[in-house]
């Protein structure tokens, strides 16, 4: 059996619980809550049209991958960027997409009606 609590102890417990709830409400209202993730996720303010873009200092110039990226991201980025016809644009994503693929626009193949026809090959008949 549990020990009976006095009304003073119960009131103290209730007060602590209410303080925790109030603190969490304030964090949620302010937009600064850590939902079990290591860094707090704060979305950047939307950028207005016509304003110059800013580059995140976490991205290395010319490399295209964040310096704080995980080894998994680096191991996926390096072989992919060396074996594709396109290139990749680095982005600062809160959703795990550290780069966007950009593929070159290829000219369509000419239709068979417009291609010159080769003379028929000579076949030897028996």
Swiss-Prot record:
Residues 106-126 are annotated as: Disordered. It comes from the Eukaryota. Residues 107-119 have a biased composition (Pro residues). One of its GO terms (cellular component) is SOSS complex. InterPro entries: SOSSC. Pfam families: SOSSC. One of its GO terms (biological process) is DNA repair. Belongs to the SOSS-C family. PANTHER family: SOSS COMPLEX SUBUNIT C. This is SOSS complex subunit C homolog.
């Amino acid at each position: 059996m549990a020990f009976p609590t006095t009304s003073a102890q119960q009131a103290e417990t209730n007060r602590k619980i209410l303080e925790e709830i109030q603190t969490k409400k304030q964090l949620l209202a302010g937009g600064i809550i850590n939902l079990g993730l290591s860094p707090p996720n704060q979305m950047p303010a939307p950028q207005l049209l016509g304003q110059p873009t800013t580059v995140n200092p976490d991205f290395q110039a010319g490399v295209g991958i964040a310096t704080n990226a995980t080894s998994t991201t680096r191991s996926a980025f390096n072989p992919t960027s060396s074996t594709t016809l396109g290139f990749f644009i680095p982005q600062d994503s809160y959703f795990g997409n550290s780069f966007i693929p950009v593929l070159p626009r290829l000219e369509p193949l000419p239709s068979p009606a417009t291609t010159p026809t080769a003379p028929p090959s000579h076949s030897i008949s028996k």
